[in-house]
Regions:
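C-terminal ends of transmembrane helices
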Residues: 1, 47-60, 109-116
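The first (N-terminal) embedded transmembrane alpha-helix
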Residues: 1-19
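Helix-coil boundary and interhelical linker segments in multi-pass alpha-helical membrane proteins
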Residues: 19-36, 77-93, 142-150
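A cytosolic-side transmembrane-helix exit/cap motif
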Residues: 30-36, 82-90, 109-120, 168-181
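Alpha-helical transmembrane segments of multi-pass membrane proteins
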Residues: 42-52, 97-108, 159-165
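Cytoplasmic-side transmembrane-helix entry/capping segments in multi-pass membrane proteins
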Residues: 60-72, 94, 119, 123-125
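Mid-bilayer segments of alpha-helical transmembrane spans in multi-pass integral membrane proteins
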Residues: 72-81, 86, 90-111, 133
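Long, low-complexity, intrinsically disordered cytosolic termini of multi-pass membrane proteins
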Residues: 184-214
Length: 214
């Protein structure tokens, strides 16, 4: 679920390859990840995401689209990871996994919006490559050193909870700055606004002249 919030297709591809090569025994509900068709689909989508995720602007659109893909997929992977257990446990795992995926996804997407505000493209590429490496390294660590992975995951969650509100405050300020910029450039009378007619100032009666009597 953690990896799904960062790069879903890389997570599926790595898990599928580890399962099909015998380096990892997947739970029965996740054995489908080793199917060649699933591996090819995950590999193709990872290839597309590799370039989309490193293109400023495109990466944000990609993240918005995958809000509706990563979170349900993360919940499904978490439910499948617990194996054949009581349905209540599977549902609980899905809820926790979906929430974790949503938090990671929101942190990634919000951070990318702020990074895209930078005029140079290298920070975008660096962040994307770090995410790719982090997903693979995290899954391998979970496989070989599960307790170390759990400790790192707890640290990651603490940092995410601390960082997420600050990221979205930054996104809100950036959005407000962009809105103010276009509002300042808007010509008078735009969007159907009517300019008020300027009326001449009222004439005061001249001194020394009598008022008309009734």
């Amino acid at each position: 679920a953690w990896a799904s919030g960062i790069n879903l297709y890389a997570a599926i591809l790595v898990l599928g390859l580890l399962g099909s090569s015998g380096n990892m025994t997947l739970p029965p509900d996740l054995q489908i990840l080793t199917h060649p068709v699933v591996l090819m689909a995950a590999g193709f989508m990872y290839f597309v995401e590799f370039f989309a995720d490193k293109t400023p602007g495109v990466d944000t659109s990609w993240d918005v689209l995958h809000t509706f893909i990563r979170i349900p997929a993360g919940a499904a992977l978490a439910a499948g990871a617990v194996g054949d257990v009581d349905p209540a446990i599977s549902l609980s795992a899905a809820l926790i996994g979906g929430t974790l995926t949503a938090g990671v996804h929101a942190t990634k997407a919000g951070g990318r919006v702020l990074i895209n505000a930078s005029p140079e493209p290298f920070s975008n590429w660096g962040a994307s490559l770090a995410e790719d490496v982090g997903v693979v390294a995290g899954l391998l660590t979970a496989l070989h050193y599960p307790w170390i992975f759990l400790g790192l995951l707890v640290v990651f969650l603490i940092v995410m909870i601390w960082l997420l509100p600050r990221i979205w405050r930054g996104v809100r300020r950036l959005t407000q700055m962009i809105a103010n910029f276009f509002r300042a450039r808007r010509p008078p009378g735009a969007h159907g606004e009517e300019t008020e007619a300027r009326l001449p100032p009222p004439q005061l009666p001249e001194a020394g002249k009598d008022k008309n009597s009734y």
